[in-house]
UniProtKB/Swiss-Prot annotation:
Subcellular location: Cytoplasm
PANTHER family given in the database record: 4-HYDROXY-4-METHYL-2-OXOGLUTARATE ALDOLASE 3-RELATED, REGULATOR OF RIBONUCLEASE ACTIVITY A
Domain of life of the organism encoding this protein: Bacteria
Annotated organism of origin: Shewanella denitrificans (strain OS217 / ATCC BAA-1090 / DSM 15013)
Gene3D superfamilies linked to this entry: Ribonuclease E inhibitor RraA/RraA-like
GO biological process: regulation of RNA metabolic process
Protein name as it appears in the record: Regulator of ribonuclease activity A
Family per record: Belongs to the RraA family.
Keywords: Cytoplasm
Length: 161
C-alpha cells in the first residue's frame, strides 16, 4: 500500500505525531506503514535478527540504535530476513550498510546514515518497550507511516481510504 505522509498530516494533524526530519530512505519501497514492534540496542543487531524471524505482515520494526553512526545495524542479510517474513519496513535510529542491495529489496527501510562497518551480533538490548527519539515516544502497537517526505506516528491505524 502507498502512503503519503503529507496528505495524512493534512487529514489527521490533531491525531499524529511528526518525527523530526532525520531519516533517509534506503529500501526498495518508498513508502510503508504498519503497527510497530520495537527493539532498543546499541551497535549490536542480534535482537533485530531475532525479531525479524517473526511474522511481520502489517508490521514495521522500529529500532532505537541510540543514534549511533559508527556501526550498521541493518545489512542485506538482516533485511532479507525481514522480506522473507513479510515485514512492511524497518526504521532505524542508527545506520545501515549494503545500501545498493537494500534498495533492491521489496522492503521499506529508513535510517540516519550508511556506514560499511557492521554491528556485533550478541543479542544485547531490549524488545517491545517504549522508545523515544526524534521528539516522539514510540509504543509497541502504535502505527507508523513513512515515505520520502517524513515519518508520522499514530496511536491507532489511520483510515487511508
Amino acid at each position: 500500500m502507498e502512503y503519503n505522509t503529507s496528505e495524512l498530516c493534512d487529514m489527521y494533524i490533531d491525531v499524529v505525531d511528526v518525527v523530526e526530519p532525520m531519516f533517509s530512505n534506503y529500501g526498495g519501497c518508498s513508502s510503508f506503514g504498519g503497527a510497530i514492534s520495537t527493539v532498543k540496542c546499541f551497535e549490536d543487531n542480534g535482537l533485530i535478527a531475532d525479531a525479524l524471524q517473526e511474522d511481520g505482515e502489517g508490521k514495521v520494526l522500529l529500532v532505537d540504535g541510540g543514534g549511533s553512526l559508527r556501526r550498521a545495524l541493518i545489512d542485506a542479510s538482516i533485511a532479507q530476513i525481514a522480506v522473507n517474513n513479510n515485514w512492511e519496513g524497518i526504521i532505524v535510529y542508527g545506520s545501515v550498510r549494503d545500501v545498493d542491495a537494500l534498495e533492491e529489496l521489496d522492503l521499506g527501510i529508513q535510517a540516519l546514515a550508511s556506514i560499511p562497518v557492521g554491528a556485533e551480533g550478541n543479542g544485547v538490548g531490549e524488545i517491545e518497550l517504549p522508545v523515544n527519539f526524534g521528539g516522539v515516544t514510540f509504543l509497541p502497537g502504535d502505527h507508523i507511516y513513512a515515505d520520502n517526505t517524513g515519518v508520522i506516528l499514530s496511536p491507532e491505524p489511520l483510515d487511508i481510504d
